[in-house]
Every structure is written in C-alpha cells, then in structure tokens.
C-alpha cells in the first residue's frame, strides 16, 4: 500500500483544528476560534498567519463598534487542501490486518 503524503501545514494540531472549524462554519471570529480550540491568543495568531500566508484562509480585520474584530474565512484553496488532507489520512487508516 502506498501512503499519500500529509500536508505538513495542516498536520499541526492547532492549524488542523482551525481548519476543521472553518470547514463547518466557513468563517468565524477570532474569540470563537480561540474558545473552541483552547489556544492562547498569541499562538492562535501565529497559526492563523501561517494558514493565511498559504492562502488557506482569508483574514479580515474590522471593528464592532469601537472594538477590533478579526474574522477568518476558509478559501477554496483551503477547502481543497483540507479535503486532500482527509483523503490522504484515510490512506493511513484503511490498512487491512491479516493474520
């Protein structure tokens, strides 16, 4: 059996969690992602920057009243990368054990 390579950008736990949230929600605000992942604000910011630099997500900075609001949205490139990652992961899980 040939295993498909796993995207190292998505293989990191926090980045995978962010992408999983965005796959099901399409977009989410920073505090929601932070709450759902249990990440620190600093670490989450770094990981979001990496996903954004790769073109997997778009980051929009706006204001809600006078407060800053960061919104993350998955891109079509990010959706395709996530789907490819899931398919590659399945190649590792689809192992038949013979006795």
Predicted segments with their positions:
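Accessory beta->alpha helical hairpin/"wing" motif in late/C-terminal subdomains of nucleic-acid enzymes
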Residues: 74-78
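Glycine-centered, phosphate/nucleic-acid-interacting loop/turn motifs that mediate DNA/RNA or nucleotide
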Residues: 55
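N-terminal helix-turn-helix DNA-binding core of bacterial DNA-binding proteins
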Residues: 2-40, 62-64, 71-73
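Short beta-strand "wing" residues that participate in macromolecule-binding interfaces
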Residues: 59
């Amino acid at each position: 059996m040939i295993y498909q390579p796993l995207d190292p950008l998505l293989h990191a736990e926090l980045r995978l969690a962010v992408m999983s949230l965005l796959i099901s929600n399409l977009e989410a605000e920073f505090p929601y992602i932070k709450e759902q992942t249990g990440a620190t604000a600093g670490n989450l910011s770094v990981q979001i920057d990496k996903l954004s630099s790769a073109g997997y997500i778009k980051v929009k900075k706006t204001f809600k009243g006078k407060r800053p609001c960061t919104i993350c949205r998955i891109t079509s490139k990010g959706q395709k990368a996530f789907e490819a990652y899931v398919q590659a992961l399945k190649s590792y899980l689809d192992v038949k054990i013979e006795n």
